[in-house]
């Protein structure tokens, strides 16, 4: 049976008219795993929600390498049609966290400092530059430690890993080296494929199915350093509250999950942004506008980016070494808005306006650019040390 036929039989529809040939990853020898998989696929195929334990078990089945491409396609297709629940997201994320390579920075934890992540889902297909990556350096420049989780481009021209490489940052570091970056520089990059190596078992099915899947949502939910504060952009407004609730269940203390009215998975400067705020275990939803941050509105066209080289040039201009070469326009403003949210989430800033003021100081003092330069130099140095060691 082809994966297309399997998906049709399971869901009653053709998923995005996708033809996916069935290729098995291997035999399942444990009869309990066979039973779990068949029961789970039957349940979700009928449009019923999985329990947290069932979702955990399904992801365990995938990450352990027992699942076939056909099973993974069926699961992802059914979830796409049915829609994910908080319990399912928490179950999937719990299994991914269990399999993840952990990062253990020590200095911030010893001092009781927050650790921030600005990882979003990606997938908004708007072609903007890497706003959350630029914002991460602004946050670090303001004195808040950052564990930036990210990946290469999947649905856009340039992912966070791509632009960081173009900025001179090594992304192929060992876990201990990433922890040193966070401890000594104040910011480190957690390259998702290296941190979540077991997700390789799902890559073929994901690519063959095409489009966004639950794995897009799981990135912000599975920070390997256990970030306590987050700003997570989502590609669809309906996911904001769902993701905020899941983050709370997973132990994050404060978060802003955002979706711009112009379709951005960032806080927008073009108009309204939907916000789901997690604080003290509760989630509330509201909208913000650029004026709340003391910023001018600007159209989407003014913040578009390009490939990794072009986006790196934009970030260099936003974080310019001198006032003469520093950009003062929409690129800078959207970075300040998103950095402000991360600073509020961390507790460093008291509100949006205070956050923008701190973000502006981080840029104009040169501190944000210093963090970028320091991470590039340090990552190159430690990567070189590990390769020259006997």
Positions of predicted regions on the chain:
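N-terminal basic, low-structured, amphipathic or hydrophobic segments
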Residues: 14-19
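A generic, well-ordered mixed alpha/beta core segment in the N-terminal half of proteins
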Residues: 120, 124-173, 177-181
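N-terminal glycine-rich anion-binding loops that anchor highly charged ligand groups
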Residues: 48-89, 99-105, 334
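Active-site cofactor/substrate anionic-group-binding motifs, chiefly glycine-
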Residues: 85-147
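Glycine-rich anion-binding loops and their surrounding alpha/beta cores
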Residues: 43-45, 50, 98-101, 106-109, ...
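Charged, compositionally biased N-terminal leader segments and the immediate start
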Residues: 33-46
């Amino acid at each position: 049976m082809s994966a297309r036929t399997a998906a049709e039989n399971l869901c009653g529809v053709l998923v995005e008219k996708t033809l996916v040939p069935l290729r098995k990853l291997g035999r399942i020898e444990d009869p309990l795993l066979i039973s779990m998989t068949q029961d789970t696929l039957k349940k979700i195929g009928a449009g019923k929600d999985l329990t947290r334990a069932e979702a955990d078990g399904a992801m365990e089945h995938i990450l352990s390498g027992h699942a076939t491409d056909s099973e993974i396609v069926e699961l992802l297709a059914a979830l796409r049609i049915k829609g994910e629940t908080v319990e399912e997201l928490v179950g999937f994320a719990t299994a991914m966290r269990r399999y993840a390579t952990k990062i253990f920075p020590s200095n911030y934890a010893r001092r009781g400092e927050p650790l921030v992540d600005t990882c979003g889902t990606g997938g908004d297909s708007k072609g903007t530059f890497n706003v959350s990556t630029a914002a991460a350096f602004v946050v670090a420049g303001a004195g808040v430690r950052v564990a930036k989780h990210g990946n290469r481009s999947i649905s856009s021209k340039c992912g966070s890993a791509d632009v960081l490489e173009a900025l001179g940052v090594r992304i192929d570091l060992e876990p201990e080296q990433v922890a040193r970056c966070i401890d000594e520089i104040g910011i480190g990059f957690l390259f998702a494929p290296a941190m979540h190596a077991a997700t390789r078992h799902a890559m073929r099915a994901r690519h063959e199915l095409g489009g966004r899947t639950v794995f897009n949502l799981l990135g912000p939910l599975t920070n390997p350093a256990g970030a306590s504060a987050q700003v997570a952009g989502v590609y669809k407004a309906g996911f904001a509250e769902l993701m905020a609730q899941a983050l709370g269940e997973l132990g994050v203390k404060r978060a802003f999950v955002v979706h711009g009215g112009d379709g951005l998975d960032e806080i927008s400067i073009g108009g309204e942004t939907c916000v789901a705020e997690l604080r003290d275990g509760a989630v509330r939803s509201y909208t913000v506008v650029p004026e709340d941050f003391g910023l001018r509105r600007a159209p989407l066209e003014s913040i578009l980016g390009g490939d990794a080289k072009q986006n790196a040039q934009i970030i260099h201009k936003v974080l310019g070494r001198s006032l003469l070469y520093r950009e003062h326009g929409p690129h800078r403003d959207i970075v300040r808005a998103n950095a402000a949210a991360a600073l509020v989430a961390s507790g460093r800033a008291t509100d949006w306006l205070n956050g923008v003021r701190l973000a502006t100081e981080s840029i104009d003092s040169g501190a944000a650019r210093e963090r970028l330069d320091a991470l590039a130099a340090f990552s190159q140095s430690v990567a070189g040390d590990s390769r020259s060691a006997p």
